[in-house]
Amino acid sequence: GITRGDEVIVPTLTFIAAVNPLTRYVGAEPIFIGCDDSLCIDPDAVEAFCAGHCELRGGKLYNKTTGAHVKALEVVHVFGNLGDMERLTEIAQKYHLILIEDATEALGTRFTAGKFAGKFAGTVGDIGCYSFNGNKIITTGAGGAVVSNHPDWAEHAKHLSTQAKTD
């Protein structure tokens, strides 16, 4: 659902591989937001950006400066630390943002308290991504995994993983 010209909120502390699929390959523009003490994207800064620099029109969030549709929020869980998914989920719902989790560096990390207690990193948002590159927690040499609570998105990701063949 993210297309050329859309904007995506991303953290400043990340590796470019977490941003490239959204920007370089799809054509969206990144909006870099700072991180909190967890080293994950700061919910207060995300809320301040959405409330102060954007406006909701017709159920969509628009950047007042660029006029672009702000379509998604990407959370990158780093060094085993989890972003504040309770707050970030509320913000994503309030502003109608797709919530993407890059859980590569928190694979196996589980929420221990709150609304998401027992859930694993990457399973809270609309879509979760994991890399299995040679320098990651679990390696396969290359590749990764995508999980989603949207069956049609999961099916589309599966289609793309086979070089988008239709036979």
Report the location of each language-model feature:
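Active-site region of PLP-dependent enzymes
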Residues: 105-119, 124-167
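PLP-dependent aminotransferase-like
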Residues: 2-78, 82-94, 98-106, 110
